[in-house]
Amino acid sequence: HSDVVPIETIMTVVARHFALMTEAGFENMTPSCITSFGIYTEILHTWETHPEWEEKTREFLWKATKREFQKPKNLAHTSDVIYKFRNEIAAQKKYSLVDIHTGRPLQVVDHIGCHYAKMFPSKGIGGAEFPAVLSGMVSAWGGQPVDYPERRHCCGFGFRNYLVLANRGFSVANSKKKFESMQPYEPDFIITNCPGC
């Protein structure tokens, strides 16, 4: 988003989030927003490779808020945390992802938010091409993940795509393409790990 908001501003906003985390006594961060996860990952990487940017950000944050921060010891998307405990959750579940009338596993299509693993494939479970975070949960809980041709296609949401009126046609066209790709498989439901999607 640095073409719309200066990168220094984005870094300072992220630093404020880290400061709030630090002030609350937490060491780990688990954002549910895919875009935030991608931005936090990118900024931590930038600070690692360009420490002068981190120092500049610390100065901006202090000047604006009189706050300081520690970087998170661990950064994981919320879906990664749930995935990590999927088997423990399965052992305690009351219901499985199974049709109660037929015993057939529910057919589930997933949509992985673009900023989950496309920017940094090593940070997402299964990487960018074959993300397994949601399908792994579905399998562990008795459902049947369904692969479909446009599984990795963007849903079209994107802040610039949906929030800017002139771009909404692009957003709707992407969603339509995605839904049409799912339709022949007659899924019982769709899951996603992105609140925007």
Regions found by a protein language model. Give the residues of each.
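Iron-sulfur cluster-binding electron-transfer modules in prokaryotic oxidoreductases
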Residues: 1-197
